[in-house]
């Protein structure tokens, strides 16, 4: 059985698969991080709106 050298297309497809998986992980992490950040900012904004230091104690 003769062994053929792997084609550049095969290497390219493998690289594309790996990079797309990495990009997917990055995007998922960014989405989760931004959601947490938005939730934190929303809670903080809500808290400052409820407990405004100019009005004194809540």
Curated annotation (Swiss-Prot):
Encoded in an alternative reading frame of the T-cell receptor gamma chain gene which is composed of variable (Vgamma), joining (Jgamma), and constant (Cgamma) gene segments. Originates within an intron directly upstream of the Jgamma1.2 gene segment and contains three exons from the Cgamma1 segment. It holds the Pfam family TARP. Induction: By testosterone. InterPro entries: TARP. This is T-cell receptor gamma alternate reading frame protein. It comes from the Eukaryota. Detected at low levels in the ductal cells of the salivary gland but not in the acinar cells (at protein level). Expressed in endometrium (at protein level). Expressed in epithelial cells within the acinar ducts of the prostate. The gene is TRGC1. Signal peptide: none annotated.
